[in-house]
Regions:
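Residue-level signal for pocket-adjacent positions within structured domains
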Residues: 30, 42, 211, 215
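An aromatic- and glycine-enriched ligand-binding surface/loop that stacks and positions planar moieties
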Residues: 56, 64-65, 79, 83-223
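Proline-centered turn/helix-capping motifs that create local helix->coil transitions or kinks
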Residues: 26-35, 124
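Short coil/linker segments at helix-helix boundaries
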Residues: 32-53, 99-111
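Residue-level signal for well-ordered alpha-helical segments
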Residues: 3-4, 36-43, 193, 197
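Conserved, well-structured interaction surfaces
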Residues: 1-30, 44-57, 61-77, 205
Length: 223
């Protein structure tokens, strides 16, 4: 790829990261799967499955190599950038570590920690939580700094890109709960005194929505 322009190298790197993302979804769902790095030919129709460990190692390396040609924050909203690549490495390595792929949990957890530390050092949280969820707010520099990968919408609110995640009334096979958040998510929000629910005297197990961090009600729908 030595003869490619800088912009072309960026595009190739974005594609490599996206391919890694989709293979990550496959091995997370199915484990060992058929694995291609080039367009398959007709005689490869019944190709053997490749070990999920081999695929995971490959896609982690792909993302690491791709970071060389990506900006930390994409100039064009909705595009892959360096922080997304490292964030994906973190998520993929956590998968391998948590499920002890190939008996290499320690190695994968180390990779995950290193990738996460790079993103944490470069990206900051938005100053106003509400801005994350409104069009006007999403255009602000501090909000863009928090959003690692955006899903772009038209001004009328319709999605101009393919929806990456399921959104509906029921749980999906990829583990998304859609409009049904888990209790684990709800319990992560502190009380208004800044303490966790297992520490705060303000927490009421019978009325868990009371005295909670304002982001609790901004995130979760309640009756």
């Amino acid at each position: 790829m030595d003869d490619l322009s800088k912009k072309s190298l960026q595009y190739v790197s974005e594609v490599r990261v996206l391919r890694a993302y989709y293979y990550y979804l496959l091995i997370a769902l199915w484990g060992d799967v058929p694995f291609y790095t080039e367009p398959p030919t007709s005689d490869q129709y019944e190709v053997e499955k490749t070990s999920r460990v081999k695929i995971l190692d490959f896609i982690i390396n792909e993302c690491n190599e791709a970071t060389e040609y990506l900006d930390w924050i994409a100039m064009d909203r909705g595009r892959v950038d360096k922080s997304f690549a490292y964030g994906l490495i973190n998520r993929m390595a956590l998968l391998g570590g948590s499920l002890d792929f190939g008996g290499k949990s320690t190695e994968y957890f180390k990779i995950a920690a290193e990738a996460a530390s790079k993103v944490i050092g470069k990206r900051l949280l938005a100053l106003n939580y509400e801005d994350l969820f409104v069009v006007e707010g999403q255009a602000k520099a501090d909000v863009r700094n928090e959003m690692i990968l955006e899903m772009i919408y038209n001004v009328d609110g319709t999605n101009v890109h393919r929806n990456w995640t399921g959104f509906g009334f029921v749980s999906r096979m990829q583990g998304q709960t859609s409009r049904h958040p888990s209790m684990l998510l709800a319990d992560t929000y502190e009380c208004i005194d800044g303490k966790r629910i297992d520490e705060s005297p303000l927490y009421d197990v019978h009325h868990p929505q009371k005295n909670r961090d304002p982001r609790f009600k901004a995130t979760l729908w309640m009756h």
